[in-house]
């Protein structure tokens, strides 16, 4: 790269680096998963009960000691017939979770640094670990201010979450008279969550944004001039306790009546739901031993440090700068409460089991919207006709044929609390104000309010049929659907330059527009007893979808999203396009020589080996910031998804496998850093090195280049076929088990996520995102794990 730009060779003796560091190979490891379950049940004519439990342990595939998940569950079900008409049922589940985490995905994660760190840098620096480096090599500033040694980050990461959760249900049903029943059901969930995190004194190299300490020219900690110790810029301890309580109380009346061949049922009900949250947060600077075992709030204090920092000005003169660090312990609380009130009714009718009709309406009120928009009405109707019950239908090969259709509207309010009202937030770095020479904590504006927020609605029309053939061995189900989402709830990714993300704020939630999905769902299943000992069952599911944005509720007609490089976006929610469509520059190969550059439309800064961009509007100039030269580059929504399963049983042996395929979805490589000495994708091994060497991958360069503008060069076909599961089991014959008083013993081996066939160069072609307008943008997504399981099921 340096030679290509006319510079000196940076590493004359590259053999001195040995084999280098394969960061990804060093980071990933095999991790065990263990799962133990038990269950017991019993009862009498009036009482039934069951108890079950499980112990689950899983270690992370990166740094198992810092990334793991442990869960214990206990479950109990109880049913009692109090009288002939009054019945009681209860359910109680206790869950205990202990989880440790590292930064797992996206920018700032261990994996992101592992993908981009130079292979010329070793993991360790050869020191005893007592100095600022803690024994880990520095990643040079030439690799950017944010790229750090991923193993150093792991060493300095301490996050622990402990959860105790109780989930339960109590239900009473009473048969008032024949055909009339009243049911009242109370569901509850309570969770107590305790988080503790620790940011130790850490130095990752010159000018790194993650540094919590500074060092002098001798690579030693800079200390307080008053003798107070090492200057701590922002390390510390955070602890918080969060309580979640939610309940739902439903009461409904159900009336059923049959006369002649008519069957009627009516249901009327009401539902009250509440979700409450209360959190207490604290943060402070640790004193005493700098360790995880000492990292508790009671070991923190306010700090005030003074130190001298020397540096060189552009002329080489020494500049002495007196610095002060003052940080007080902070505490804050958070309170959320959401409430819902619903009324609903349903009527169902069928005649002789042949003609089916159902209608339902809900009225839902939610405090997640302002007073003028809290209530939504959501009706639905459906109908069906079972032709095989008609006297005129007499086809031996067709055992069941039902045609059906439905229309309905549902509502969505999953946007969090208080999006419609402005709030203040405090006790954070953004909410500090200077009074004289002292910085004081206060409050700052939180997420911007949108008082006009309203329900997102999903209107769906379905037409389909269900059919069974050849003595019910062959089943086919097909649906054609049109789903229209109006007032789509979305948080736009707004640039901080616009001010909405400054000072601790965030972009408001908006009703962004209208999208439409239409497609086909097809399910085909076949089962057959091939012989007395051999049984086969297989199935195929196919789903197609065409997504289109019908309306965007702003003047521009689009909302940008997705992260790429520095300040660039990848995707758009734009009228006429699928949601999350990738939008950028189109490419037309690589400039092979100066003559090609001269013959092409004017492209600023172009050199042989650079990407040749398409002049979209044909005006003779490729304008990098112009709408006219941008185009649709793909979208993350698959044209088709397929699922396949196969089950075989032969005597005591059983075999099962399932496959999943996604066809037509694209993804963006947005996990690369375009810096001189950072790691590069393997595709750069086939880069342009001279005329005729490559027409797909540009030259390597240390200088600023337009090759790193977002274009279709970074968009890949992410279609894939995944072997999701393969399992082989053996059940010991019952004749053998009778001798040892057992009902069933099955031993099995299984593999999950066995292999993925794909051309995508990232870890996982199935790139997800909570924001649908930024789906398919791979920021360094954590890979799916492959698991191998050996298990045994025992029943007494």
What are the residue ranges of the model-derived segments?
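Surface-exposed loop/turn segments flanking beta-strands in extracellular/periplasmic regions
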Residues: 2-18, 109-148, 201-228, 278-329, ...
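Conserved small-residue
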Residues: 1-14, 104, 277-289, 510, ...
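Small-side-chain secondary-structure face that scaffolds active or pore-lining regions
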Residues: 61-71, 81, 93-95, 101-106, ...
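Residues embedded in well-ordered regular secondary structure
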Residues: 1-66, 153-155, 173-175, 324, ...
């Amino acid at each position: 790269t340096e030679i290509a730009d006319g510079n000196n060779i940076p590493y004359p003796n590259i053999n001195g680096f040995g084999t280098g560091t394969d960061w990804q190979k060093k980071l990933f490891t095999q991790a065990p998963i263990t799962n133990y379950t038990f269950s017991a049940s019993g009862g009498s004519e009036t009482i039934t009960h069951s108890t079950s439990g499980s112990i689950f342990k899983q270690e992370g595939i990166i740094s198992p000691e810092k990334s793991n998940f442990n869960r214990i569950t206990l479950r109990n079900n109880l049913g009692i017939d109090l009288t002939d008409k009054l019945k009681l049922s209860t359910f109680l589940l206790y869950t205990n979770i202990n989880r440790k985490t590292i930064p797992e995905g996206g920018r700032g994660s261990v994996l992101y640094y592992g993908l981009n760190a130079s292979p010329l840098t070793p993991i360790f620096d050869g020191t005893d670990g007592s100095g600022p480096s803690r024994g880990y090599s520095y990643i040079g500033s030439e690799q950017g201010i944010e790229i750090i040694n991923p193993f150093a980050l792991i060493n300095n990461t301490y996050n622990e979450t402990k959860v105790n959760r109780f989930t339960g249900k109590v239900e009473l049903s009473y048969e008032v008279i024949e055909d009339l029943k009243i049911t009242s059901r109370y569901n509850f969930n309570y969770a107590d969550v305790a988080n503790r995190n620790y940011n130790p004194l850490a130095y990752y190299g010159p000018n790194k944004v993650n540094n919590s300490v500074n060092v002098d020219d001798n690579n030693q900690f800079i200390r307080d001039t008053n003798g107070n110790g090492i200057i701590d810029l922002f390390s510390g301890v955070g602890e918080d306790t969060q309580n979640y309580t939610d309940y739902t109380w439903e009461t409904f009346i159900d009336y059923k009546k049959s006369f002649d061949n008519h069957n009627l049922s009516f249901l009327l009900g009401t539902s009250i739901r509440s979700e409450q949250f209360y959190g207490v947060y604290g943060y402070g600077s640790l004193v005493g031993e700098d360790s995880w075992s000492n990292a508790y709030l009671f070991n923190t204090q306010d700090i005030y440090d003074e130190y001298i920092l020397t540096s060189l000005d552009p002329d080489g003169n020494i500049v002495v700068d007196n610095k002060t660090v003052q940080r007080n312990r902070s505490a804050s609380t958070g309170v959320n409460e959401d409430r819902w009130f619903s009324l609903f009714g349903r009527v169902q009718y069928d005649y002789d089991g042949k003609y089916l009709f159902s209608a339902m309406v809900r009225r839902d009120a939610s405090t997640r919207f302002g007073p003028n928009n809290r209530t939504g009405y959501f009706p639905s109707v459906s109908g069906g006709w079972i032709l095989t019950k008609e006297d005129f239908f007499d086809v031996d090969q067709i055992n069941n044929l039902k045609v059906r259709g439905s229309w309905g509207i549902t509502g969505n309010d999953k946007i969090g609390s208080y999006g419609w009202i402005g709030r203040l937030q405090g006790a954070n770095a953004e909410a500090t104000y200077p009074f004289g020479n002292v910085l004081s904590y206060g409050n700052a504006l939180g997420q911007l309010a949108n008082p006009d927020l309203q329900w997102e609605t999903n209107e769906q029309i379905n037409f389909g049929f269900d059919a069974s053939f050849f003595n019910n061995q062959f089943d086919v189900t097909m649906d054609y659907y049109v789903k229209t989402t109006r007032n789509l709830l979305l948080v736009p990714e707004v640039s901080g330059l616009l001010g909405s993300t400054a000072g601790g704020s965030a972009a408001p939630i908006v009703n962004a527009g209208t999208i439409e999905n239409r497609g086909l769902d097809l399910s085909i299943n076949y089962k057959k007893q091939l012989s007395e000992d051999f049984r086969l069952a297989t199935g195929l599911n196919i789903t197609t979808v065409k997504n289109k944005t019908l309306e965007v509720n702003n003047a521009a007609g689009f909302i940008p999203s997705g992260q790429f490089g520095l300040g660039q976006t990848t995707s758009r929610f734009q009228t006429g396009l699928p949601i999350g469509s990738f939008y950028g520059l189109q490419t037309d190969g690589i400039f092979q020589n100066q003559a090609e550059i001269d013959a092409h439309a004017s492209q600023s800064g172009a050199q042989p080996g650079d990407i040749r961009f398409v002049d979209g509007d044909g005006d003779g100039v490729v304008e990098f910031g112009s709408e006219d030269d941008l185009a649709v580059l793909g979208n993350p929504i698959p044209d088709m998804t397929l699922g396949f399963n196969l089950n075989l049983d032969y005597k005591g042996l059983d075999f099962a496998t399932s496959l999943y395929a996604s066809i037509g979805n694209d993804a963006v490589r947005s996990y690369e850093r375009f810096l001189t000495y950072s790691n590069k994708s393997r595709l750069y091994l086939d880069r342009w090195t001279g005329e005729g060497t490559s027409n797909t991958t540009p030259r390597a360069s240390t200088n600023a280049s337009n090759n790193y503008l977002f274009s279709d060069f970074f968009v890949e076909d992410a279609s894939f076929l995944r072997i999701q599961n393969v399992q082989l089991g053996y059940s010991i014959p019952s004749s053998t088990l009778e001798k040892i008083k057992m009902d069933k013993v099955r031993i099995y081996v299984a593999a999950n996520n066995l292999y993925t066939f794909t051309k995508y160069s990232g870890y996982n072609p199935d790139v997800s995102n909570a924001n649908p307008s930024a789906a398919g943008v791979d920021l360094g997504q954590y890979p799916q794990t492959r698991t191998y399981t050996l298990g045994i099921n025992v029943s007494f």
